[in-house]
Amino acid sequence: MNTFLPQKWMRLLFVLPVLNFTFGCTQKFNDVSATVQEAYGNYIDVELTPEEIESVPYASAYLKIGSQKQVFVVLAFAESNPLTGQTQLKWVSADKAMVVTENGHIVKTIGLQTTNLAGVYGDVPAYSHSSAQYVLSYDWSEQYRYGFQAHVERSHQGKEILTTPISSTETEVYTEVVTFPSLEESVENTYWVDSDGQVVKTRQHLGPTMVPVELTILKGYSKS
């Protein structure tokens, strides 16, 4: 069980807002990760109590890669994507990994112990019970693989109650089949969406033959 040090989070109140983070600024990235790590002891396979989660003054989530143990991540930055107009959420772990999402869709990763996603581009329609088809473009940083077109078919699967240590939420479950014609491969992703249309849990493959990445929101992001 993780040994949590709530008072350490007070340092985050001063560190995170002034960092003006960019991906190219390694020192600032390290500062965020180090501060998060100092806030609690064992950040791998962590299971926080409801009180510990509520003590964190930022949005937070559990991140799990394949069969690896889950880690705790916090929302360090929320920035508008000028290409889509969507808010990009940048989740940071204590071991210097980052996952970037746009309403639950993982669009970039840094420092994961798997093939990292350099970018996903394209317009994703809002969630509805009607089926949807759209096209995305995938870039992977490993071996500089860029511009792989993907055809996506999304369908509604029904309702499911999603339970975390601090909430129980009725969700609509959607699956999407992502097909890469040039690779003759496909993957299936799953999204749990609340009544406000926000993704509160996702299980996604970053590409063909890659292990799934699972992100479960504990405390959600709010613009207010």
Language model features: what each stretch is:
Residues 17-18:
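Hydrophobic membrane-insertion alpha-helices, especially the h-region
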Residues 21-24:
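C-terminal motif of bacterial Sec signal peptides marking the signal peptidase cleavage site
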Residues 118:
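Acidic/charged, solvent-exposed loop-and-adjacent secondary-structure segments enriched in E/D, K/R, S/T
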